[in-house]
């Protein structure tokens, strides 16, 4: 593996918009990630952008593969998700995965959807976005060459103004 590149992106002024953050896995290895500090400034929500590092997958899937449909073992993918979930202080049973297909469907999810797309099948065919107002859930979306839209508000839905 090559040497890690430290990345720090700032906008005009001094506010950092994307930072690196490492978590320690149960086995002592590191789970490197990126995050948007602006989304965490009030301490209510947490965000994480995974890299390909810090997981258990091998070969062409090395190391933090998060998809099962391409030949990696389900056990490896589940362990990799366990590492992501642990960074959020939870486990894969509280993760909800989406399946993007370049449409415009946004699904509202809640506790009843926990584990969907990972520990149990999805109840919908696709969702290009997921949203929740329930704490303790990890919403997971997958991107390769698309820009992921991320938004957050601490207001309740009926208090939000457009």
Residue ranges and their predicted role:
Residues 4-120:
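A short aromatic-anchored loop/beta-hairpin motif
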Residues 126, 133-134:
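Soluble metallo-hydrolase cores and metallopeptidase-like ectodomains found primarily
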Residues 42-45, 136-137, 148:
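Beta-strand-turn-beta hairpins that frame and shape the catalytic cleft
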Residues 134-135, 155:
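Short acidic-glycine loop/turn motifs at beta-strand connectors
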Residues 129-130, 139, 148-152:
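Short beta-strand scaffold segments in enzyme catalytic cores
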Residues 53-57, 146-147, 155:
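Short connector loops/turns at beta-strand edges and beta->alpha or beta->beta junctions
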Residues 153-162:
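Conserved small/polar residues in nucleotide/adenosyl-binding loops
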Residues 137-143:
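Helix-hairpin-helix/helix-loop-helix acidic hairpins
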């Amino acid at each position: 593996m090559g040497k890690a590149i430290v990345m720090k992106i700032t906008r005009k002024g001094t506010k950092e918009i994307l930072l690196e953050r490492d978590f320690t896995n149960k086995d002592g290895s590191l789970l490197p990630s990126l995050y948007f500090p602006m989304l965490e400034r009030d301490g209510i929500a947490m965000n994480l952008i995974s890299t390909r590092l810090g997981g258990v997958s091998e070969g062409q899937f090395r190391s933090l593969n998060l998809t099962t449909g391409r030949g990696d073992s389900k056990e490896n993918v589940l362990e990799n998700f366990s590492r992501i979930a642990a960074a959020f202080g939870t486990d894969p049973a509280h993760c909800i995965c989406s399946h993007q297909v370049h449409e415009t469907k946004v699904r509202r999810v809640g506790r009843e959807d926990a584990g969907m797309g990972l520990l149990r099948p999805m109840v919908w065919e696709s969702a290009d976005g997921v949203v929740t107002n329930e704490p303790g859930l990890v919403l997971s979306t997958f991107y390769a060459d698309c820009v992921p839209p991320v938004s957050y508000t601490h207001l309740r839905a009926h208090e939000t103004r457009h």
